Amino acid sequence: YQDKEAVYRRFDSYYDFDRLRGAIRGRKRGMWKYVAAAAVIALPLLVSLLLQIRQEGIFPEERMREISLLPGKSMATLTLSDGSSKLLSPENFDLMDGSKRIVNDPGGLSYQVEDTSECMETAYNEITVPRGGEYKVTLDDGTRIWVNSESYIRFPVVFHGDERRIWVSGEVFLEVTKDSERPFVVNTEKLDIKVLGTQFNVRAYPDEKCIQTTLVEGCVRVDNSLGEVAVLAPSEQLLYNAQNGKHEVREVDTELYVSWKDGVYVFVSQRLEDIMLLISKWYDVDVFYQNSTVKDIIFSGRLKRYENAETLLKV
């Protein structure tokens, strides 16, 4: 394995947004991405707020009609062990990485290795998902991974040895295939998360100060860079502060943190700024606030992840 710092130095290159978007989409971003106060238009639960904002002249009605925000979709870039890459979308194709067969279809990408004895040398693949994208991957052991917008994973094409280890930056949800003899390890820049078989969500964006590990079922052990260990039970979440190295464990409603993989955002008493942090990655927009006081407005509700934002503007 490459040392951890070397791996995460590679992550930084994937957050050169101009390069990434140019490779993935090859088109310029329109000026609609820079609409001031876009934070107050992307949620269907904000009817009363929108009316208030119109009255105060913060976001004129004629300006709202100019906005066209599309939801994200299945797209990513696959980088093979030889350094070549392929753009991924919900189309059917097969390809080979050495002797390993990779199948892509509308359900995502899957790795099929019939004879692992032919794959003794460890080869790695990488999947990079841009803003406005998502992708689903099934590893060779059957583990399923939902990769959210602006995220990256690196993994062996075939797992060898006494553990199954992958590297993650951004947000992923995992359904880990049980294997009592080979624990599954998720490496983030600051944490190692070890499981035998379970369902959990990891949110570890480089531009966010906290790393979240949310357990749905099973049991996970989390080791931080200071050597401290925490063991999570179902419905528990570990919050790790990447700035001071401290962590806390709390009980949560897991739906709030994993519903994105099922096409829904669920909010309960959340600040508008925190909500828009999620929305901005999915709709691929940059959020600006003319009035900073709206950041602290609290909302509860549900937002369909695949809803065209234009329909959300009609109040």
Report residues per predicted region.
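Positively biased amphipathic helices and basic secretion/translocation or surface-docking motifs
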Residues: 2-33
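Generic alpha-helical secondary structure signal
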Residues: 5, 12, 18-19, 38, ...
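Low-complexity, intrinsically disordered regions enriched in charged/polar residues
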Residues: 10-14, 43, 251
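Compositionally biased amphipathic helical and low-complexity segments enriched in hydrophobic
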Residues: 21, 44-46
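A residue-level detector for the "anchor" residue at the start of short, highly conserved motifs
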Residues: 28-35, 47-315
